[in-house]
């Protein structure tokens, strides 16, 4: 069963994908997607906030992808993988109410649903590296 937040993340991913692939305005895409897939008011706020944040911080998120998936140029990643990573990295770094393991799991599920055969494994590996680096940084601050 698809959770409410998972469906919201699917809509965010679809908007990011369409913007990345076709250059369409993400907010316009969201409006269309939300007409086709009505959501609760809470989810609509979550969807717009998350989409706008990922779009706004795309360059910084891509730098994170370059750092943690250095063997894979961001521009050569599939549109789905690239946007799943952007979304998840944003959630891991900036969404304090989303546990890291949940953000990773949600990203892996998105990759399974929308990505290629090896997408889920790739996404999991990159995000595990991001998570470990954040944990290492937090531990260094505590010392």
Swiss-Prot record:
Keywords associated with the record? RNA-binding, Transcription, Transcription antitermination, Transcription regulation
According to its UniProt entry, the protein's GO biological process terms are: DNA-templated transcription termination; transcription antitermination
| InterPro entries linked | NusB-like_sf, NusB_fam, NusB_RsmB_TIM44
GO CC term (a single one): cytosol
Q: Which domain of life is it from?
A: Bacteria
Which one of the record's GO molecular function terms can you name?
RNA binding
What does the protein in this record do?
Involved in transcription antitermination. Required for transcription of ribosomal RNA (rRNA) genes. Binds specifically to the boxA antiterminator sequence of the ribosomal RNA (rrn) operons.
Family membership, please give it. Belongs to the NusB family.
What is the protein named?
Answer: Transcription antitermination protein NusB
State the species of origin: Dehalococcoides mccartyi (strain ATCC BAA-2100 / JCM 16839 / KCTC 5957 / BAV1)
The upper taxonomy is: Bacteria, Bacillati, Chloroflexota, Dehalococcoidia, Dehalococcoidales
Designated gene of the protein:
nusB
């Amino acid at each position: 069963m698809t959770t409410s937040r998972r469906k919201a993340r699917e809509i965010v991913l679809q908007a990011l994908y369409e913007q990345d692939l076709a250059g369409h305005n993400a907010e316009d895409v969201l409006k269309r997607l939300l007409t086709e897939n009505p959501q609760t008011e809470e989810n609509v706020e979550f969807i717009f906030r998350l989409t706008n944040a990922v779009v706004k911080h795309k360059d910084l998120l891509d730098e994170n992808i370059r750092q943690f998936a250095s063997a894979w140029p961001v521009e050569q990643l599939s549109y789905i993988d690239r946007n799943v990573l952007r979304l998840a990295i944003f959630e891991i770094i900036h969404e304090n109410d989303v546990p890291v393991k949940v953000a990773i799991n949600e990203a892996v599920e998105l990759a399974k649903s929308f990505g290629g055969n090896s997408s889920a494994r790739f996404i999991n590996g990159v995000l595990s590296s991001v998570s470990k680096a954040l944990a290492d940084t937090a531990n260094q601050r505590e010392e």
